[in-house]
Amino acid sequence: MSEPEVTSVVDMKSPNISSSCSFFKLKKLSEESLLQPPEKVFDIMYKLGEGSYGSVYKAVHKESSSIVAIKLVPVESDLHEIIKEISIMQQCDSPYVVRYYGSYFKQYDLWICMEYCGAGSVSDIMRLRKKTLTEDEIATILSDTLQGLVYLHLRRKIHRDIKAANILLNTEGYAKLADFGVAGQLTDTMAKRNTVIGTPFWMAPEVIEEIGYDCVADIWSLGITALEMAEGKPPYGEIHPMRAIFMIPQKPPPSFREPDRWSTEFIDFVSKCLVKEPDDRATATELLEHEFIRNAKHRSILKPMLEETCAIREQQRANRSFGGVLAASQAKSLATQENGMQQHITDNAFMEDPGTLVPEKFGEYQQSSASDATMIAHAEQGVDEGTLGPGGLRNLSKAAAPAAASSAASPLDMPAVDSGTMVELESNLGTMVINSDSDDSTTAKNNDDQKPRNRYRPQFLEHFDRKNAGDGRGDEKPIATEYSPAAAEQQQQQQQQQQQQQQDEQHLASGANDLNNWEHNMEMQFQQISAINQYGLQQHQQQQQVLMAYPLMNEQLIALNNQPNLLLSNAAPMGQQGIPAAAPAQPPPAYQNQHMHTQSHAYVEGEFEFLKFLTFDDLNQRLCNIDHEMELEIEQLNKKYNAKRQPIVDAMNAKRKRQQNINNNLIKI
């Protein structure tokens, strides 16, 4: 069991960074903390942005008061990749790699607790300042980044997604590697990897060509990152990513657009990173000895950049707070005017008992006076049902907006805004993963005390989702209070989700019913086919009995088919010889044609009269063929049955397999 380590940290002086503070610096979560529900261990502050496979939130560790970053990953995501990320982070203990503290399974979400880097990513800093970095700043950041790559590569780990968005800075100016969602492990039996993984613009040529790659693939990405920090975007950043994938292996290595602005040492450093032949490319250890890195200045030169970034965030926070207060003031003034307009009518109607809710028809309630016209109705789980005004529940939706705006204006309800850790790129350049690798899993604590009927989702996440909706860059907004107008929308969204879930369940149930109905219909069809076969057999037996009783009928039928006029010439002799008078005379040509036409539809229409006019050989041949024809029909029906049944069975097996994989991963953890 490990306890939080006490460390004194002196931050750089800035408008919103304390000059000196002493607090517990987390090193690893204790066993007691891992056994508790995560919401009892942490206080979630607000959302920072999006990382690979999940959203990242800023939180406070209650026991040590340390600020941490928590990635919440739904179990519906690729659990194998998530566990691989945890495994790699868990094995790393370096000041140049984001530290891993522990993880929880809370019902249907995985909570990954990591080190918090308050300055945010390099791409965030460039975006907020709206300018690129200087050469000295780039050298200092690349020095720490190379230290982190040396640490990983010595342990045969490939990051595979090096870019400015995955290089985080803390308030002390340390650069740390983050987001190991696509990292890989090289083993003794795996000299190189062949999977296409990474972000297209930063991807090495050998990764795109799938010819096998190793740790130096990160060096190519580092060179592209250096160009990104110097010019604001990677090479080919203005074209479509899929087109860039084809251009990177074919074109010469990229370089600076304006080389005159940069020193020869910096240009040479980038050229050694961007060597297309992996065997000729420099390693992280070799690049640490490069003149450009050896001449890098102390990280204290990053202080003005970090202070400027923090000042911009502080200004954005103040602007949002002022805008919220102004909007709340206007809403409050409007609400006062509306109450004043309705007060005269209310006073005339209810003068005796102000402030009392009196029953009205149909179970509704109406207030006696506008003096006490505001009452917040709290529903279960903190859902805001709005404001009860003079019109009672009928005016609920109209009065909810002013009250919610007034509530949202409270400074206590307006948390600090920070774009902090793992905020998505402005251009939304995601990480592309093609194919998959298999790596070992890691350790996490399962905190699923009891399985709920519906998926558990903390209420604060709904606020964050609404707050960040439509913001592709991950900028922060104040948390919506429980009295906000968005609360009603939240309740409506929850109802829609429940309805959708019920529809999905009904769809699955109907699918099972369809399968049962299909099997029942097939059984009925098989029974009908058997009945047809049995009927044909009975007809054949009856025909044989007739032929045995009248042996000359076969010869006469043959003669009838060969000579149509024979029946008329021999009608009297046949009667004299005892042939049954019921023997048919020669049918008219139209009648013959009709029966000839109906022969092909006999089994469909249920007409078997035409069999009387067939010869014994024809009947015998038809009897021999009917078994084969029935077998073909049964085979075709069986194929149709399997074609409709197999997709349902495959879907059910896939769900069982996926559930089994999740259970196996939980057991490993």
From Swiss-Prot:
What EC number(s) does its UniProt record assign?
A: 2.7.11.1
Q: How does it associate, per the subunit comment?
A: Homodimer. Interacts with Sav and Wts. Interacts (via SARAH domain) with Ex. Interacts with Kibra.
- Specify the taxonomic lineage: Eukaryota, Metazoa, Ecdysozoa, Arthropoda, Hexapoda
- What is the source species? Drosophila melanogaster (Fruit fly)
Protein name, per record: Serine/threonine-protein kinase hippo
Q: Which residues of the sequence carry a binding annotation for ATP?
A: L48, G49, E50, G51, S52, Y53, G54, S55, V56, K71
What's an example of a GO molecular-function annotation for this chain? protein serine/threonine kinase activity
Per the entry, induction is: Transcriptionally regulated by Gcm (Glial cells missing).
Establish whether keyword Transferase is in the entry.
Answer: yes
